[in-house]
Amino acid sequence: MVHRGLLRGAPVAAEGELIFTTAATGWGEILTDPSYAGQIVVLTHPMAGSYRIDPAELESTRVHARGLVVSRLVTPPRGPGRSLEELLIEAGVPAIAGVDTRAITLELRRGAARRTVIRDGEQSDRAAVAAARQSPSWDSVDHVASVATLRPFTVPAVGARRIRAVLVDFGVKR
């Protein structure tokens, strides 16, 4: 199935497993959540981007989702933090806006996981579908390796009480 919309975020192509979330807010948290590694996220809520994202509320230090699908992407008022689109551009992650996300969600609920591509309009529908079919399935990729910490690090203590703990990181959230 091909859905046409407006390319937003980073002007690049992306491929991944298409999944959806019904969250009305928390877009920065969703995109930076390690559990979304390798996935293109559909937001079922009809509007995204209405507020600025506080970096302290992100789930990790970088965006793990491969792409974003929204019905309507808006620009928030000026203020501290980044807009949703700024976060996507800085992370090199594309979005597609102006599509019927509820219809896409119903399609997803009826079937198995879908390999998906976000591409610009230069590619034919047939070529886009072929690219999606040829992309690796989500479970054939080691996503833990892409989200796990490569080197030990120390988290600074907060408050007077200090403890020593060890965490094995398979994609830990902040």
Stretch-by-stretch model annotation:
Residues M1-R174:
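N-terminal beta1-alpha1 cap of cysteine-dependent amidohydrolase-like domains
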